[in-house]
Curated annotation (Swiss-Prot):
Gene that specifies this protein: gpsA
Organism annotation: Orientia tsutsugamushi (strain Boryong) (Rickettsia tsutsugamushi)
Binding site for NADPH: 11, 31-32, 105, 137, 252, 277, 279
Gene3D superfamilies found in the cross-reference section: N-(1-d-carboxylethyl)-l-norvaline Dehydrogenase, domain 2 (1.10.1040.10), NAD(P)-binding Rossmann-like Domain (3.40.50.720)
UniProt-recorded name of the protein: Glycerol-3-phosphate dehydrogenase [NAD(P)+]
Keyword tags: Cytoplasm, Lipid biosynthesis, Lipid metabolism, NAD, NADP, Nucleotide-binding, Oxidoreductase, Phospholipid biosynthesis, Phospholipid metabolism
Cellular component per GO, a single term: cytosol
Amino acid sequence: MKIAIIGAGAWGTAIAMLLARNNYRVTLYTRHSAHTQEINQLHTNKKYLPNIILPNIIKATSNFSDIVDHEIIIIVTPSDQVRATIENLKQHSISNNAIIGIASKGLDHNQSKLLSDVVKDYLANNPLFIIAGPNLANEVAQGLPCALTIAAIQKEVQFNISTLFHSTNVITSTTEDIITIQVASAFKNIIAIIAGIIIAKQYGQNCKASIITQGIKEIVAFARAAGSTNPDISQFGVIGDLILTSYAITSRNTKFGYDLGQHEYYTNLINNTNPNLIEGIKAAKILYPLTVKQNLNCHIIDCAYSILHNGSKISYAIECMLKKINHETK
């Protein structure tokens, strides 16, 4: 079986290692020839996974044509690059039998769509799955125990993809709910930013746990509005991913939130921030108008948007959010 992964960052490489440990040959696509040479000759990916040696059966390429005949193609690019990647696959006339996987986090930046809907726009006949879980890429690469959720409408795809990853160290779960898992992947980074601010501003762990609980409510509300009839939040790729992202201080979004909480305005930190690495910044900009349009009470999204994109004072925005949540629960 020929498996390709588009995106040789930390998470893409970690996914490749999971498959390689189960003796599947994987082709990693990266745009940079120097990156390709490092992976193929040194079996390392030092920029993203320092001190990790890659299995020899992982091969890299910078030639997109090398991967278009693969039976399974997993996209692990930043969310703002997914549409262009799908367009590229379409232009290369990949087989209708090729199974497309999405491991990217977030929403489409052009049309504010779920990434699965972008795939359907271009590759409507191809089977599709979403993969997510509470996983730090470095721990996965080290071979530590981890868990994954495989979301796919077709039961056969759920089973086949789950089987590829399952091992004594990898727990897998499956669900038909491809909507909630994608909504959670977009919301979790925003919730993590606010959770980081909460700790930096010394509101305490109780408050942080309450915010995460509120975040789950907002994920469910948005997932229903997006078409999920019964949001499946119990999955590793939903509540598990949210908990890890919000509590791991090594999480980029949580750390960014903590750093942000040392100040009163985002502008105090903006020159030291790469918004391309902090998915929650972009996600808040996309999600806020969608929640307003759907008339949803997503107070965490409102708070994040006001801080990151509307210049609000951080302490004031947090207090307003807490008051709204308190009022709503009465």
